Amino acid sequence: MGGDKKFYYYRILTFSRIVVMLLSIINQKLSYMDIQQSSSGQIVKSPKGYNAFVPHSLPPKLDWNNAVVNSLSRADFLLGKLAREGSQLPNPHLLMRPFITREAVLSSKIEGTQATLGEILAANAGAHVKQNPDDLQEVQNYIKALDYGLGRLSEFPLSLRLIKEIHKHLMQGVRGFLATPGEFRRSQNWIGSPGCTLNTAKFVPPPPDNLMECLSEFENFLHDRSLPPLIHIALCHYQFEAIHPFLDGNGRVGRLLIMLLLVEQRMLPTPLLYLSAFFEASRDEYYKQLYNVS
């Protein structure tokens, strides 16, 4: 039990410190559509007359001040401890299954899904659950999408193709299914309060005509290893959310990317670190930090 206690202790420490570091790096990187011109991108006028934000390609010029360097150093140190503890577990996949399920519940909850951890566990055990079937399916799809992505990573690097495949697993048979699961959007989407329009939205991502160029540059940066891994992962998460390439499911795919990149870059042997608990508890701050980058 001593080893288990140490594992959870380091996990909690790493969890909190890396979240703070990620948000700090995202915020310092570079202001969303209440936006004017920004150092992280430009406002373009679409052929239909609305304004949209097109992010610059990565990496940006970063300010390596003491706060960033200290946060990064501490996060790397704690993440290394978590990786070592995780590599010593006799059956990490069995131990991590409840955490993966919890991550799926909380990541989906950020997007409005109401299913609880207890309901998902009960449904997985074959019990009848009164919760909306769509909510249950969305969480179960998240787990399937993560499992699929991890399996593919053992054969192929992260790519636009793999991201589309993950999105297809995530959106299969649930709300948003008609929004072309597994395909990048061919129409404009936007972010804002219910009932808002393209002209009143808080944020409008790249128009369809600009989308594939943005995604091509994003894929190139996915394979760039010139930055410290945690900086790279934070920037990838931001850039994906700024591009918003799917009609639905972008937030969940973006958070899945964090876990997949941690494994792909060998920062963790398995997905031992789950950020959605922090993102859900600090949802307003999470979105604020993302908006502040653009």
Please place each PLM-identified region on the residue numbering:
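FIC/Doc superfamily catalytic core
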Residues: 2-294
